[in-house]
Amino acid sequence: MEEIDYHWKCQLMGHEVWVEPLSIIYHKGAVTLPVSSPKKTYLNYRNSFILLLTNYRASISLRLFFPRFFMECISLVKEILTFKWGHAFSIVRSWVWIMGHLGVLKKRR
C-alpha cells in the first residue's frame, strides 16, 4: 500500500501520475502472509482506512467515511455468515485500531 499512498499524495500535490501499460512488474504478493490469513485481512482493512483518512481533506473524508463503513459492515456480515470468525474479528479489530489512533492519523494529514 505504500506505493498507492505515495502516488496518491503526489497526485494530490498536483503532480501527474503516469502508467506504462507495456511494463512488466514481478511482485511477490502474499509471500509473508497468505491471502487466507486473518492478519492480512486486518492489515488490508486498517491500511485502506488509513489512506482514506489521511489523503483527503477532513470534509471529504467525513463524506466518504459512512459509505465506506457501510461496505465494511457488509463484508463483516459476509465473514460471519461464512463462519470465517478470524476474518470477522480482524475487520472489527481494524476499526478499533482506527478509533484508537484518530489523533495520530489527524497529525499525519
Describe each PLM feature range.
Residues 1, 107-109:
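Short, intrinsically disordered, charge-balanced linker/junction segments flanking boundaries
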Residues 16-106:
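Active-site-adjacent helix/loop segment of glycosyltransferases
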Residues 1-24:
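A short, conserved alpha-helix in the catalytic core of glycosyltransferases
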